């Protein structure tokens, strides 16, 4: 008798074995981090999204088989393709988000993954993607989920301005703060050029069938308060981040 495995399950198992970060990037991870922007889900590593789709911080979910109810998790998102500095030739990184305090919830994503939630906003509040329309490449945005060290103590003042986030070295950060390898990862692309279009996207549903939505009211990060601002003229050099100020309440 022949047994057929549902294609969705096959795709999920294949995803577990494939690298979930861009080629050449470290740290690596082979487990997929589910990344959900409102009802738009990053189904495939490297998928292209419309800039507007990623305007707010995504929800996260991890394979239920990997969930440890006692574990606290940390989320990091990086842009790997910030245009070079004046006179430079190498693209740089930008820390778009570092959010601590994630814990497993009781909600399931399509019965296979557990939604995570945090009441914290920092130490580096979310900056949405915004690659310049004048750039020549689509930017790669990497999402990483780490087990959060109990002793981790990062002040919000460390990322008070966008300039403090440029050139962020995730490997050095991990070494200096005792952060172990990521448990899961994912990445997507956003192309700032007007002619760019998003590739296939999917919707995410919780076990009850309702579209996954954020739960709880985010509270202030407990680190030092700081203001994030982009000096006029700096925007074009970065990933197209609009002029804004985010106050860590």
Outline where the language-model segments fall:
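N-terminus-centered regions that define maturation/targeting leaders and the start
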Residues: 15-223, 227-249
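Classical eukaryotic N-terminal signal peptides for Sec-dependent ER targeting/secretion
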Residues: 1-10, 230-232, 236
